[in-house]
Amino acid sequence: MENPIKPVATRSIGIAVVLLVVGIVIGFAVGHYTVATAPSKPAINTFAAGSLKYALGNDFNPQYTNLTGVRVGMTFSGSISGAREVQEGKNYSVFISASAPILYQDLMNDTHYASWQIIFSANEMAITWTNPKYSILPSWPYWFENITENSTIVAASNASLDPSGFQAIETMKLAGLLYTGWDNSSILVGNEPVSYYVRLAFDDNFAMYMNYNKAYNDWFHGQFGYPVNDSLALYHQIFISKYLNGTTKLTTVEIGLDGYLTAGTADYALTYVSQAINQGLSYYENSTGGNGLPAWINLGSVNKTIDDFYEQINESGPAWDNVGNLPGAPIFYSITVISNYTNPYAIQYVYDLITGLGQHYLSMSKFDPLAQPFYVGDVPAQLKPLVVAPPSYLPVSSYD
């Protein structure tokens, strides 16, 4: 059966864009969801994850305003800090998070700032840089050596303020598990041992696995003295050892990471593929031009088995860089309308972001918009035809 929430394929630019815009204009005329025309349309005060700054701020919002006459007042920052602003009384009408669980836990669950959310796009973690000196070639599979050298400076977001921070932590933990877990019989979450997922990831090719395992142990055991097959060595080296010696730097929001790279104060940044595209950063790619970090660790999968593997680790970090201990989960972007500050045009904005025009601009920025968005909570009637219940195979931790 076809995956009901698979990402939409990236669209080409040109005639398709013209047709898309024309189609949307016609849609407004013949039944597209709208509200009654008013003499003065209030701006939609909107918070969005910083990683959406280009897709929304530069592309979607201007087009939306051209089509509707409704202005969009934007604030871009870390989703966790944005949720705290809502709790403190900031009057956002629309809230868009880079982590559906953060939106649910901070604004829906026992807090009642919102009564629903729609999950509409995925994303992937990547290793990025600007200085060619630090390029990681597609032919080089052992990327973890480059980013963990003592002299290498790595930048990431602070996990307590921004989802990309704890998603970077999850990615490093998953990589450690993937490269050490062939014989790991521990059943951490679910019904299968870690070894089940590792062997699937390597297509039961033990020789291929051993290439990675040997490189991992030669590096972390041989160079740094970690125990053999220590699955947390990669995570520990970046987020504890290098942080303590000043070669891992944390920032408050992912849109600031490029500043570290362009200023030369960091050699690599752990951030989203979409950020690499929007900010003109180089990123680690495989030989076919895709993300060099495989789906098993980049948190971009909407496949049941891979998502089950994500759950084998959690998001917890060291005391200075920690948000909690929820299980690992895909990177899902979600959107809601804040209950106390509902703008009459807020639902229309949500409608257009999760359908054709919004999907187009998200795809241009290397997000993975879902062909079938899904919802949690009491979604408004105007949006119900666009969404489905969460697929049963997705771990609840990916959206709750």
From Swiss-Prot:
InterPro entries, per database record: ModA/WtpA
GO BP terms, alphabetized: molybdate ion transport
Pfam families given in the database record: SBP_bac_11
Keyword Signal: yes
Domain of life: Archaea
Entry GO MF terms: molybdate ion binding
Keywords: Signal
Signal peptide: 1-31
Protein name as it appears in the record: Uncharacterized solute-binding protein Ta1052
Originating organism: Thermoplasma acidophilum (strain ATCC 25905 / DSM 1728 / JCM 9062 / NBRC 15155 / AMRC-C165)
